[in-house]
Design a protein with these regions (language model features):
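Short coil-to-beta transition motif at edge beta-strands of beta-rich domains
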Residues: 45-51
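Hydrophobic-ligand binding "helix-grip"
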Residues: 29, 55-101, 107-109, 139
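Hydrophobic ligand-binding cavity/cleft-lining segments
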Residues: 1-43
Length: 146
């Protein structure tokens, strides 16, 4: 079973600044509990960099495919053994002075036997996730409406 979902939200940052929030270290700023660990010891945005995250007692291994700050894009391979594996892509596009639209796409394949493991990334739930991300980024940026 495979799930491909995508969504968008707007942020009050230029695309060039916004992409920094979607790097392994940048997500520390706005994602509660996000604490990437680097087997090689040091953070890096280089292609091939491996980092690990944990959520709810489940570990996910990530590999940087590419972080292109000038192009305001990022791509990662990720695997959560026994659950799912796939690719995550982020693209930031300027929409107005100091504002950009963030596009996020997940392409995940089920590794286990329980299709429910992909539900969080299914279309309806993905929209909710994008809303949560939008609010979290806005709160980090100090938006009083967040």
């Amino acid at each position: 079973m495979r799930v491909q979902s995508s969504g968008q939200f707007d942020v009050a940052l230029s695309a060039g600044d916004a992409i920094g929030l979607f790097t392994p270290e940048g997500e520390r700023l706005w994602v509660p509990g996000w604490d990437p660990v680097y087997p090689e010891g040091q953070p890096s945005e280089d292609s091939g960099t491996v980092f690990l995250t944990e959520s709810g007692g489940v570990e996910t291994t990530w590999v940087v495919i590419q972080i292109n700050r000038p192009g305001a894009t990022a791509a990662y391979a990720r695997t959560t053994p026994g659950y799912h594996a796939g690719v995550v892509r982020v693209a930031c596009v300027d929409t107005a002075a100091g504002h950009s639209t963030i596009s996020v796409a997940y392409d995940l394949t089920l590794l286990g036997a329980d299709p429910a493991e992909l539900e969080a990334h299914a279309v309806g739930n993905f929209e909710d996730m994008m809303h949560e991300w939008s609010n979290a980024v806005a709160a980090y940026l100090g938006d009083p409406a967040a």
